Amino acid sequence: MQLKRVSIVISQLLCIFSFSQAVNSCEDKTFWQTWYQGGQFKGFGISPTKEAVAKAQYLFAENHYKGNLLTKDYKRALDLFKKAADAGLLQAYFRLGLMNHYGQGKSKDLKSAYTYYEHAAKTNNPEAQFNLGLMNRYGIGTKKNLYTAFDWFTKSANSQTILNQNKCTKIMKGVVEAQFNLAQMNHYALGTEKNIFEAAKWYEIAAAHNMKEAQFNLAQLFFTGEGVDYDIDRAIENYLLAAKQGLAEAQLNLAQIYHYGPSHLQNYQKAHQWYLEAANQDVKEAYFNLGLMAQYGRGVHQNYVSAKHYYLQSASPKIPESYLNLGFIYHYGLGTPVNNDKAFEYFDKAASQGIHQAEYHLGIHYRDGRGVTKNNDIANYWFKKAKAKDLKEKDYINDSFAFREPDDVDLYVK
């Protein structure tokens, strides 16, 4: 009776999912789908093969795992994947790896996940190989080993022949994330010698698959000329691709090229547009530059109120020029009433970060008693400190607003 019940279940499975009895199962568009060869089941009294049972278990498990046609049930899926794996179906090991990795249907077990991924990798499963690469790169579920990570990323990044549960072969393209990681490993000498040429090759391959991080890093190489020929046009092309996908670093760099770049590339309207996009992701540098554009009327009408708003958004120890410019706004009453207390506060913050113009104007406030008790000794201290920068007097007396030169050209997505 047990044998008959198993046969009935498998037969019902065929009916439920309306499987064709294809002459050549390898032609199926859904490569991992389970197929049953014509003539395999001849009646309820015929015992299904161990392989057929494993395939049925795998199919049931997949549908419980994804919630397709069957109720989503991780615990049931886990049990069936285990049975299929125990019966020798290697494809089940990858799912077991994922379920242990992310705690689906059971508690998270990274060591077991690693072991299951290793079994799955024997079938040239590129996703399993990629996960093994990540786990070795970051020491997840195993000891950190960059050399092993590099090997797994190399396998996963390249096209390879894989075998499904019906022993059909298929060429699988490399995993894009593995291609990006392989580029990084070559770029930063992780598990291999530094090779910018190889890094650029793999960034370009991943970028062709529309991976924004790869597009950005490729743009950086072209922009800096690191390991490749300097090519500002290709840099802009790749920044633009990444920026349109919402990568804040690309939006900022693209804006800075249009803002500060060579005259034939300057376009204040485009710069303003991309600064706004980056600012919407709370990029402080973008806020600061929007303040400058509002202050000087570049790409927009001059507006001190808007400038102050953006400087307040960007003000931080990492961008002390914002403090200086706010100091000037309150010192001279630009778009707001003169406020010596506020001016002193912001000059003091900028001076604490070594901004020489702020040091000089802090001296003025102490000398004249603006926003602070008059104190000539402290005033002279700040005047001397500003002059000690060995700058020409016009540099630190000049009341011009501070510009912040683009300083993120060496920033790569890691």
Question: Model regions: which residues?
Answer:
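Terminal, low-structured helical/coil segments at or just beyond the last alpha-helical repeat
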Residues: 373-374, 378-414
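Hydrophobic face of amphipathic alpha-helices that form TPR/SEL1-like repeat modules
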Residues: 57-66, 80, 95-102, 131-138, ...
